[in-house]
Amino acid sequence: MRLNDNNSFIGINPPYQLMVIHSSKLIYPREIYQRGVERKRVELIARDFNEYIVNEPKVSFRNGRYYVMDGQHTIEGCILLNGGADRPILCKVYTGLTMEQEALLFAEQNGHAAPLSAGI
């Protein structure tokens, strides 16, 4: 149950804030831990996109920039649905993470399902 609209729930304080960020401001840290964008996956996400069930991309705000930890295919699917133009994206934004913590969270939540870049 939401008490107010500052992202606080009864007894729960999530480690992120929901924020709308323009996709042109989102960085995919491929040289560090992200995998490349797979066009077929983006097209599948765009084809089946449902805003009621989509997971918000997870983003780390570090050094004044927004780094995508998870959800790059969702972001690219939204852009594809927007005719290829950048657009606002609802994101879960985490603060206070190091690059290493971002990489660890990415790897743990994705279960090492595919090879990570040489940055790890």
Predicted regions and their residues:
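Amphipathic, charge-rich alpha-helical segments that serve as recognition/docking helices
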Residues: 90-120
